[in-house]
């Protein structure tokens, strides 16, 4: 390969005439040179670089890019495969763990099924827990219950703690001996009646024990421990009919309702009513002194009214019973029969069935007889049915009568040179509570006296006779007489406002008694709006032509508008 310069020299060597001719032509042509633009200079600078790249091999670049793409794709695919494998291994391990748990449960069920004395062992563990609880209570300071609680036998345990069959009705032991005695198993009676009708998950034992009435009773009585409730029952004499039909009082202690069938009434205590409203509890509240206290032979709840009468809440329209609260019958009548009652006691009074007199409290019945009231139609007055609490004045007097402890003040005593002055100061400080009590008593007496005076003044003002203006019919010759017009009936709030005006107008020149009725009932001229009393009197007596509205505040009058423009 020859360069272009060598080709040119060779061409000139072979054709010398051509070069001379070309040179002759060049002499005849004028060349005009101009400076190059910056773009041409940059292009000239880049030419060797472009030439180098052009001379390089393009096949090597394509191979490198393809190799890089292959490596990237390979790494991404490997990462996805590793993640998928890890997830599959984790899922497999989880399944194996669940299989092991199920196998362990099956093995446990097989061992329990083979064990014939399983129930006895469970009862022993419960008894052991009871003894541990008793020992803990004795160590905690309950020494008075230790002698009684150490003798707790299996019968007492059965009253307080349910056995395995109490957890679920359908949860029976797997042994053949227990299947033979299915008819003899005791079905537990739940204290709370729920609305749930679902039968799912019957084979799984519940984590919560059913509410035993014995435990609930000792909670209601306020005892600190279960042993105290068992060893110290609260006897209550209640009428009970024997087999002969003769009513005899029986003692009722705290015992489960499901173990004593028949008519039962628990001892009434206001603290057991509305346990979820303990903060709002008040002994004078009507709803706090009423509630469910037992059940009848037909397992119907017995409702105690606030006056002590025992009833069964029964709807008067559909004869539905079993309501455990007064609000229940209110909701039932409102939703089912579109009947609204203004209060719960009124709803109970109209939807009730009284128990027989032998099951009622004779003292309460005697109160009804004294007042000639019918329990089916009336309630006892609240002041008779509910005893009033003691006045808090006695408590304050007891507090004031408590012995006072005089504190020593040695530092203050050192500052006093005269000991007699220091003793007088101490005596004065000790006597300040007595002086304060006397001052408060005098203040109460003054306030009562002022209230009595205000009541007397209001009564005297109300009893003031109404003197109407003489009618024109009196001067007429006719014998017919017309009755004086009745004064307008005013509300109590308007009467109080009028009394205040009378007291404020005592300092005026003319007394209020000398003014006519229209002036007395007229509103104060400083008020922006007329009073109701003035409107009533104006309607009765007619408009007054002499009374004209003042034009002082009439800003739209023509004279004022003209004066403002000028």
Swiss-Prot record:
It comes from Saccharomyces cerevisiae (strain ATCC 204508 / S288c). Residues 557-566 have a biased composition (Basic residues). Present with 339 molecules/cell in log phase SD medium. Functions as a component of the transcription regulatory histone acetylation (HAT) complex ADA. ADA preferentially acetylates nucleosomal histones H3 (at 'Lys-14' and 'Lys-18') and H2B. AHC1 is required for the overall structural integrity of the ADA complex. The gene is AHC1. Component of the 0.8 MDa ADA complex, which at least consists of ADA2, ADA3, AHC1 and GCN5. The keyword Mitochondrion does not apply. It comes from the Eukaryota. This is Protein AHC1. Residues 25-42 have a biased composition (Polar residues). Residues 1-65, 231-256, 384-411, 449-566 are annotated as: Disordered.
